[in-house]
């Protein structure tokens, strides 16, 4: 998504499956040795989500026009909400350093290094502003990954801000409380319409 504002290009990017080759939520999810002994493995939550998603898709029925597609995207929010509320406890007691240790496992899209260089040139000439808008669970993870990738490619990290959900932490600590909250004081970004709303807010 891109638009021109005051002769400067505003570039709004997705993260999972766009900048990266694959979804990165499995890297944000804690390893078995990082969770409480009685916590289920992340795959259990993935299976429960897929059951909810499949049931919702079946009940919604076939999509034959644009209005039905918009309704589908709005309605699926309840599936995403249920999934996040279910998974909250999985992150309790984990920290950013643990997630940061898995950044090296991210596979970026071919051409991303060249894209970083292109963005850095245009930001330096004040002709570009770039942001990420994502349904991901950790803006800190994304920000750390972008910085590490830019350093590896020898360019400056110029994406101004990552608008994504965040794992809440205890005051004065990076220890996670278990809650997943929206960016800043905003509601959580869970669906396509949520992302569109955020993009419009950034562009306004």
PLM segments and residue spans:
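Short, surface-exposed amphipathic charged segments that create phosphate/polyanion-binding patches used
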Residues: 172-188
């Amino acid at each position: 998504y891109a638009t021109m504002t005051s002769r400067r290009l505003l570039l709004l990017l997705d993260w999972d499956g766009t900048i990266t080759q694959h979804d990165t939520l499995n890297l944000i999810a804690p390893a078995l040795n990082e969770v409480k002994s009685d916590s289920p493995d992340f795959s259990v939550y993935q299976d429960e989500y897929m059951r909810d998603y499949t049931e919702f898709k079946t009940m919604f029925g076939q999509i034959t026009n644009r209005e039905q597609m918009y309704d589908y995207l709005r309605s699926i929010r309840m599936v995403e909400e249920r999934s996040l509320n279910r998974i909250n406890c999985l992150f309790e007691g984990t920290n950013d350093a643990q997630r940061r240790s898995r950044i090296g496992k991210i596979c970026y899209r071919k051409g991303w290094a060249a894209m970083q260089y292109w963005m850095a040139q245009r930001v330096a000439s004040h002709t570009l502003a770039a942001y990420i808008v994502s349904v991901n669970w950790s803006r800190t993870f994304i920000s750390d990954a972008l910085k590490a990738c830019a350093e590896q490619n020898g360019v400056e990290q110029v994406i101004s801000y990552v608008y994504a959900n965040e794992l809440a932490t205890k005051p004065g600590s990076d220890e996670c409380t278990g809650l997943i909250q929206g960016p800043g004081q905003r509601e959580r970004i869970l669906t396509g319409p949520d992302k569109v709303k955020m993009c419009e807010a950034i562009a306004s």
